[in-house]
A protein has these predicted regions:
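N-terminal functional modules and adjacent low-complexity/disordered segments of proteins
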Residues: 1, 17-19, 30, 169
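N-terminal positive-inside, membrane-proximal cytosolic segments immediately preceding the first
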Residues: 1-14
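Generic secretory/membrane-interface signal
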Residues: 1-2, 22, 72
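Amphipathic alpha-helical "stem/stalk" segments
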Residues: 8, 27, 31-181
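Hydrophobic membrane-insertion alpha-helices, especially the h-region
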Residues: 13-25
């Protein structure tokens, strides 16, 4: 009888131990998921930061303006640099869309960011000029279908930015008075 009671108690303690262990494993998995989510968001934001910094640390800004104002005067080397820059931008958009598709969206202050909205807002900057649109048309075959759909819709509804109109649009959005000529 004594061994039967002892056996029952040991079995009960073992069962409780297993339940506690399972609870700890579930907690650890949840914690690891949150860490993975935070790391994914960090990687995404670092990618956008690298793109933004590259515009100021290299001659990309000058080339980008030249690609809008006088795309016919771009050299082969300049076309290569701009193409590499736009490829990085597009890869970053594809990473951002993939993260959102897998539930790894980014929110701040209760505001959920939509990659589609962000892409639509930045189309004039990256793809508003003749060079940007041409680059997109030549490279759309490897771009995610969801992004192609947004770009096609938005580009069809917007005029091609050229020369001063591009800079005037930016100035008007910033509230800067146009310069009299």
């Amino acid at each position: 009888m004594q061994t039967s009671k002892l056996n029952d108690r040991l079995q009960l303690f073992a069962s409780v131990g297993v339940l506690i262990g399972l609870a700890l494993v579930a907690y650890e998995i949840r914690q690891n998921n949150e860490l993975a989510r935070a790391d994914s968001v960090r990687v995404m934001l670092e990618g956008w930061q690298r793109i933004a910094l590259s515009e100021y640390e290299t001659d990309i800004t000058v080339l980008h303006v030249k690609s809008i104002r006088e795309p016919q005067n771009l050299t082969l080397e300049e076309v290569g640099k701009l193409s590499a820059w736009l490829t990085n931008v597009m890869n970053q958009y594809m990473l951002t869309f993939a993260m959102y598709d897998h539930g790894l969206g980014y929110s701040s202050g209760g505001i959920e960011y939509s990659p589609g909205d962000e892409l639509a807002k930045s189309i004039d900057y990256y793809f508003g000029g003749r060079f940007g649109r041409s680059w997109y048309q030549e490279n759309r075959y490897w771009i995610d279908a969801q992004i192609v759909e947004i770009l096609d819709r938005e580009l069809a509804a917007r005029p091609i930015q050229s020369g001063d109109s591009y800079l005037e649009n930016i100035k008007s959005r910033l509230g800067v008075e146009p310069v009299a000529r």
